Amino acid sequence: MADFLGMMKQAAQLQSKMKAMQEELEHIEVEGISGGGLVSVRMTAKMEVKTIKIDPSLINADEAGVLEDLLVTALADAHRKAESAMQEKMQALTGGLSLPPGLGL
């Protein structure tokens, strides 16, 4: 019985730590860049896009396809960096224990 109560206490502590970490992730921002800086995307580590910046040279009808490709690339780069930031925080929380794939914050 004492083991069960100890586990419940640990679970409550972990839940509290995860909530605090989620709040931290809202304040961590990463930047994805493509086209050598022609397009950049900033997002939080919780995958919320904050800004998209586009070099004015890309804003014309002839460059629409290029701009679309660069946006996709910049978003993917920012997403990858946000995932990495989230994983670093998770490892700090779990003491390096591996969590099952897809178990994020």
Curated annotation (Swiss-Prot):
Cited function: Binds to DNA and alters its conformation. May be involved in regulation of gene expression, nucleoid organization and DNA protection.
Pfam families: YbaB_DNA_bd
Alphabetical list of Gene3D superfamilies matching this protein: Nucleoid-associated protein YbaB-like domain (3.30.1310.10)
Record organism: Rhodopseudomonas palustris (strain BisB18)
One Gene Ontology CC term in the entry: cytosol
Subunit structure: Homodimer.
GO molecular-function term, one example from the UniProt record: DNA binding
PANTHER family, sorted: NUCLEOID-ASSOCIATED PROTEIN YBAB
Designated name of the protein: Nucleoid-associated protein RPC_4847
Keywords of the record: Cytoplasm, DNA-binding
Subcellular localization: Cytoplasm, Nucleoid
Family according to the record: Belongs to the YbaB/EbfC family.
Lineage of source species: Bacteria, Pseudomonadati, Pseudomonadota, Alphaproteobacteria, Hyphomicrobiales
